[in-house]
Amino acid sequence: TDNQKPGEFSAAVARNGGQENAFTSYDHTAYYQTIAKDRLEMVMRLEADRMTHLLITAKQVAPERDVVLEERRMRVDNNPSSQLREQLNAALYLNYPYRRPVIGWEHEIKALDVDHILSFYKRHYAPNNAVLIVEGDVTMAELKPLAEKYYGIIPRGPEIVRERTIEPPARADRRLILEHERVTQPGWSRRYLAPSYHYGDTQHAYALQVLSEIIGGGPSSRLHKKLVVDDAIALSAGAFYDADDIGPSVFGFYATPKPGVDMAKLEVAVMHEVDGVLRDGVTDQEVSGAINRMRNAAV
């Protein structure tokens, strides 16, 4: 910015004993600092400056674009699990943006230029499209004046209409198989689109969290006890579900076979346990146990 030369933001945070980073997910981008309470005003001032006065040149974009390309090569192109995950999401979601990787496809990254970046920045980086999160030994009485001082004076940006994409119903099964010479341990999973806190039949989100814990949430889950302990055909087995997604979430099952165990046999065993839950339901003891484990994990 006009107030901070390249690198001065990070240097200021480090000089004051703090740490900083940023990340992008499917639903949001976050910038954060961990720093002493008496330096809170400093980082709020720096972030407000970054939100409104960012300067980017083509000369700066080129090396950073190369960094992102290299990150993609390292984390995706050279990682069979990540390759499969990309292909899986592209097949699982017919229309929702989750079918596209967060980091982007290689040709998309290569096409980014300073005009693309500044256009996105000017449209999205504004107080009316941001959430300020502060945690630690600070009160609202201390925080609110700082928020008003640094963010309250920033003009609202363009009003962004939230046009949420609708995912159409699936009409056919989709099965993916990825074979790679670097894979030393095969794995299997099955995934279903499911409601989240924000999408679809949201009233089911809490129940699905408990169900995931019962079926495959750890050593006491049905899948682990049956496939890993009793039948000894899997090295691991479980279920997963995340209700936080803005769009449709995924409820899934996974298993890693023991050496010599056929993948088809493993799939039948997993789905036999799932079918049992669909047919007979779960017990009150399983529900209370799952809730207690989830509460303990949240502390």
Regions found by a protein language model. Give the residues of each.
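Active-site recognition of the HExxH zinc-binding catalytic motif
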Residues: T1, S221
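M16 family metallopeptidases and their MPP-like homologs
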Residues: K5-M51, S81-H107, N129-E135, P186-Y197, ...
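An aromatic/glycine/proline-enriched structural segment found at the starts
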Residues: L94, V102, P127, V131-H198, ...
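Conserved, carboxylate-rich catalytic/transport cores that coordinate ions
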Residues: Y121
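Zinc-dependent metallopeptidase catalytic helix centered on the HExxH motif
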Residues: A205-Y206
